C-alpha cells in the first residue's frame, strides 16, 4: 500500500487562505514618497534608514558634481547626493526645510537631498508601469518604474543606478 503526499493547499484545506494572504503580501510594495520641485519620487521603504533635516555638509574634492559633500552620522561618513543635480535639473539651493533621506545601497549608506517627504505609499507591485521609451533625460536613467497613487504619478528610483558614474 502506498500513500500519496497531498498538501492542505491542494485539497483546499485550512491553510489555503493563509497561503493566499502570504502571496498577496509578497506582491505589495511600500515606498517613501518625496518631492523635488513639483515632481514626486519614491524609494523602497526597506532601503530607508532614517530621514533627517538638512544640515551643512563637508565638501570633498574630486567628487562627482551631484555629490554635495559628506556628513557624519553617528560616526559613519555618509555622502549626500543632490537628486535635483543628479537628474540634470541644477543645484539645489538648500534651506532648513530641505530633508535628507538616508538609504542603504549595497554596503554603503547614502543621503538623498530632497525638498520634502510626502507620505508612505503601499501598492501592489503589478501596478508598477515601465518607463516609456520616449522618456528622455537624465532622470529617466535612474528610474525603475512609475506608479499612480491617488491620481498622482510617482517615479520610483532605482538606487544602484544613481551611483553608477
Regions of interest found by a model, annotated:
Residues 1-165:
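An acidic, low-aromatic, low-complexity terminal/linker signal
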Amino acid at each position: 500500500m502506498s500513500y500519496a503526499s497531498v498538501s492542505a493547499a491542494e485539497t483546499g484545506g485550512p491553510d489555503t487562505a493563509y497561503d493566499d494572504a502570504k502571496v498577496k503580501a509578497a506582491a505589495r510594495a511600500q515606498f517613501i514618497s518625496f518631492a523635488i520641485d513639483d515632481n514626486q519620487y519614491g524609494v523602497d521603504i526597506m532601503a530607508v534608514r532614517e530621514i533627517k533635516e538638512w544640515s551643512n555638509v563637508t565638501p570633498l574634492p574630486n567628487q562627482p558634481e551631484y555629490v554635495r559633500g559628506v556628513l557624519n552620522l553617528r560616526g559613519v561618513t555618509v555622502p549626500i547626493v543632490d537628486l535635483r543635480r543628479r537628474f540634470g535639473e541644477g543645484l539645489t539651493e538648500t534651506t532648513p526645510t530641505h530633508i535628507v533621506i538616508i538609504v542603504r545601497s549595497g554596503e554603503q549608506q547614502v543621503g538623498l537631498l530632497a525638498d520634502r517627504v510626502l507620505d508612505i505609499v503601499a501598492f501592489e507591485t503589478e501596478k508598477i508601469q515601465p518607463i516609456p521609451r520616449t522618456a528622455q533625460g537624465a532622470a529617466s536613467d535612474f528610474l525603475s518604474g512609475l506608479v499612480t497613487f491617488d491620481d498622482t504619478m510617482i517615479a520610483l528610483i532605482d538606487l544602484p543606478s544613481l551611483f553608477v558614474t
